[in-house]
Amino acid sequence: VLYSPDTKVPR
């Protein structure tokens, strides 16, 4: 996924 569930920012 493009978004990390912990930080909610694009990886």
Swiss-Prot record:
Q: Where in the cell is the protein located?
A: Plastid, Chloroplast thylakoid lumen
Q: State whether keyword Thylakoid applies.
A: yes
Its cellular-component GO annotations read:
chloroplast thylakoid lumen
**Keyword Thylakoid attached:** yes
Q: What is its main location?
A: plastid
List keywords of the entry alphabetically: Chloroplast, Plastid, Thylakoid
Return the protein name: Thylakoid lumenal 33.6 kDa protein
Annotated source species? Spinacia oleracea
Q: What is the lineage of its organism?
A: Eukaryota, Viridiplantae, Streptophyta, Embryophyta, Tracheophyta
